[in-house]
Regions:
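Structural signal for hydrophobic packing residues in well-ordered secondary-structure cores
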Residues: 72, 76, 92-99, 103, ...
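Conserved C-terminal structural/oligomerization subdomain of aldehyde/semialdehyde dehydrogenase
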Residues: 48-51, 244, 281, 335, ...
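Residue-level signal for inorganic ion chemistry
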Residues: 47, 84, 106, 192, ...
Length: 507
């Protein structure tokens, strides 16, 4: 741990956790990686190394899968649904009890403001686990009446069982580490699956801490295994492993496509939550103050490093200038700083490479003739900081309007008195279809426009309304399947139909 990390205003427990060289968590034990490789973990707000992890090899992934298989066929299979509920509720309680350390680790690892870290833990991660704990006892099959012409001729019983698919591989992104971990861990445990989890190698700290809590909660050894490592090594091994029956991935569309190719070997189930370029459509009767703050949150939440980000702002021409002036005014006054500073509203980007990538889009916007309204600069100080940025242009023919930037860059465009279908066609002019929002006081217009936007999730007078019970996922190049809610259980389950013949049919 660096001298900088030692002087941070963090708890003793967090400081002690950072001081370790972190191993892999396999079969309930902390074990050394066979690769012998380590990686320093960097605080994006200071550029200082704050901790070090060991990196998993393909052999390590194999060991984790073997442990997960043994647990799936052994002790975990003997634990009933009521017991699974109790174990999950215990884990959720432990997460809440450790919120200070978890929040500090999330801030140091990822850079997000402390307020958001605390929210994603207590207001999301633990509640998400509790929500799915409630599903453990409600997963069931059906009895099915067969047709008179069926082979059993009515003198039979046919029923279905919902069974866990087996060992699940989960690949976690760096933009919301603990939230994404909970999102994949909870439905897997609820359905009775076991897991091999690969956190993003640059943000593994909260996942490592949660493994301690998994052990403390009494979840049997081998049910949850953690293999931090590079995507091209550990992630690729998970995606192609013949004994992993399902992969859940959140990340870029390009990597998602590679995972699909790797999964072909054993035709494993794949669920993907990928990129986005979500539209925010504002009609002239909308509450401008609400729109202003809604657009700010939609575009700049997590420094714009989130797949749901509302990065394409469509505003009716009658209020366009006012909305742009308001958004620029708020964005320009946002406090940019380290997440541990309680006054910070916008933290750093995750890395120097990510900031360079985002800044290249800013330059592309300028080069292609978009008008820079505010921001557009990186900060000349330690940390990977940049200003929230707003561009406008009359058309979506510029790169910043088409491609996912994954940074605090908002593109705004006016529209006129067109019919809703024409406006929706502009909003849908994207390869992505993850989220979106409509802002209006006319509920009929709001509902109609929401129905026309081709996204897996659309909100009216808010953006990215998420809740454990609301299904979430993308259309088009934004992914496959749904997470959250009852639908989030489906990828972890398979259906078995059984028919019992009572008497031979007369022929």
């Amino acid at each position: 741990m660096s001298a900088t990390a030692e002087t941070l205003a963090i708890s003793t427990e967090t400081r002690e956790f950072l001081s370790r060289t972190h191993k892999l968590f396999i079969n309930g034990q902390w074990v050394d990686a066979t690769s012998g490789e380590t990686l320093g973990i960097i605080d994006p707000a200071t550029e200082a190394q704050i901790s070090e992890i060991q990196l998993a090899s393909t052999d390590d992934v194999d060991k984790a899968v073997i442990a997960a298989q043994a647990a799936f066929k052994g002790e975990w299979s003997k634990i009933n649904s009521h017991q699974r509920t109790k174990l999950m509720l215990k884990l959720a309680d432990l997460i809440d009890e450790n919120i200070q350390t978890l929040a500090e680790l999330e801030v140091l690892d990822n850079g997000l403001p402390m307020m958001l870290a605390e929210y994603t833990i207590s207001g999301y991660a633990s509640d998400f686990i509790r929500y799915y704990a409630g599903w453990c006892t409600k997963i069931h099959g059906d009895t099915i009446p067969v047709s008179p012409a069926g082979v059993a001729n009515g003198e039979s019983l046919t029923y279905t069982r919902r069974e866990p698919v087996g060992v699940v591989g989960a690949i976690i992104p760096w933009n919301a580490p603990i939230a994404m971990l909970a999102l994949k861990l909870a439905p897997a445990l609820a359905t009775g699956c076991t897991m091999v989890i690969k956190p993003a190698e640059i943000t593994p700290l909260t996942a490592l801490k949660v493994m301690e809590l998994v052990k403390e909660a009494g979840i049997p050894d081998g049910v949850v295994n953690l293999v931090p490592g590079y995507g091209e090594v550990a992630g690729a091994a998970i995606s192609s492993h013949p004994d992993i029956k399902k992969v859940s991935f959140t990340g870029s569309t390009a990597v998602g496509q590679k995972i699909v190719e790797a999964a072909l070997g054993n035709l494993k189930k794949v669920s993907l939550e990928l990129g986005g370029k979500s539209p925010v459509v504002v009609f002239p009767d909308a509450d401008i103050e609400a729109v202003t703050m809604g657009a700010i949150r939609a575009a700049f939440f997590l420094q714009g490093q989130n797949c749901m980000a509302g990065t394409r702002l469509f505003v009716h021409q009658d209020i366009f200038d006012q909305v742009i002036q308001n958004v620029a005014g708020v964005a320009s006054q946002m406090k940019i700083g380290p997440g541990l500073d309680p006054s910070s509203q916008l933290g750093p980007l995750i890395s120097a490479d990510q900031r360079s990538r985002v800044m290249s889009y800013v330059q592309a916007g300028k080069d292609e003739g978009a008008e820079l309204i505010c921001g557009g600069n990186q900060l000349d100080r330690k940390g990977f900081f940049m200003e929230p940025t707003l561009f406008t242009h009359a058309h979506q023919d510029v790169k910043i309007a088409r491609e996912e930037i994954f940074g605090p860059v908002l593109f705004a465009q006016p529209f006129g008195d067109s019919d809703l279908e024409t406006i929706a066609a502009e909003a849908n002019k994207s390869i992505y279809g993850l989220s979106g929002s409509v802002w209006t006081k006319d509920i009929a217009v709001g509902l109609k426009m929401a129905s026309l936007i081709d996204s897996g999730q659309v909100s009216v007078n808010c953006h990215a309304a998420v809740d454990p019970a609301i299904p979430f996922g993308g259309n088009k190049m934004s992914g496959w399947g749904r997470e959250f809610g009852q639908e989030g259980l489906e990828p972890y389950l398979k259906t078995k139909a059984t028919t019992v013949l009572f008497s031979q049919p007369p022929f």
